[in-house]
């Protein structure tokens, strides 16, 4: 492995540690949550459409998403490892026989539809994603419970300290009299 490939692999691993993208391929309907900067504000915008291509490799890998907006076809290319891409959700799995679905540009209406994939591979991927999401929710819930318990313990300690201070103040008053 040469130095360039090694650096790209390190960068990809660093980005993948922060967020993980699901496994998706051309034909899948995806929702890409993109961070958009407008003036001083930053917000997350969802872009939902059909993934029509994946290209490149390593850190330069990208995917193209096509949607129809107000009757006009719009395509947008997203780098896989871009920090502006918050997350990618697979809405449904498509069954296609091509790696590049550029023929969808010429199609309108029903002829542009993609059949949903209900095969075993799609089921396994969907089940794996559901499992990962449920584990993530359970982890977040456990963190919330732990934070609530820590907050309750902190409040109890503060109340105990206040009660002790009040007792000491009463004892000091009694001693002063």
From Swiss-Prot:
A GO term, aspect molecular function: structural constituent of ribosome
Keyword Membrane appears in the UniProt entry: no
Entry annotated with the keyword Ribosomal protein: yes
GO biological process: translation
Bridged cysteine pairs (disulfide): none
PROSITE patterns according to UniProt: RIBOSOMAL_L19
Pfam families: Ribosomal_L19
Keyword list, A-Z: Ribonucleoprotein, Ribosomal protein
GO cellular component, one term: cytosolic large ribosomal subunit
Role, per record: This protein is located at the 30S-50S ribosomal subunit interface and may play a role in the structure and function of the aminoacyl-tRNA binding site.
UniProt record similarity statement: Belongs to the bacterial ribosomal protein bL19 family.
Name recorded for this polypeptide: Large ribosomal subunit protein bL19
């Amino acid at each position: 492995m040469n130095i360039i490939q090694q650096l790209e692999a390190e960068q990809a691993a660093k980005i993948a540690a922060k967020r993980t993208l699901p496994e998706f391929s051309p034909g899948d309907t995806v929702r890409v949550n993109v961070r958009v900067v407008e003036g001083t504000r930053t917000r997350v915008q969802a872009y939902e459409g059909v993934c029509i291509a994946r290209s490149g490799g390593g850190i330069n890998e990208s995917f193209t998403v096509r949607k129809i907006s107000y009757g006009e076809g719009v395509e947008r290319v997203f780098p896989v490892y871009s920090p502006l891409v918050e997350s990618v959700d697979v809405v449904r799995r498509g069954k296609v026989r091509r790696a590049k679905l550029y023929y969808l540009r010429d199609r309108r209406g029903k002829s542009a539809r993609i059949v949903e994939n209900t095969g075993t591979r799609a089921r396994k991927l969907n089940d794996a994603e559901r499992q990962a999401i449920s584990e993530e929710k359970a982890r977040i819930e456990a963190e919330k419970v732990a934070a609530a318990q820590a907050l309750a313990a902190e409040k109890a300690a503060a109340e105990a300290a206040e009660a002790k201070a009040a007792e000491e103040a009463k004892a000091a008053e009694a001693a002063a009299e």
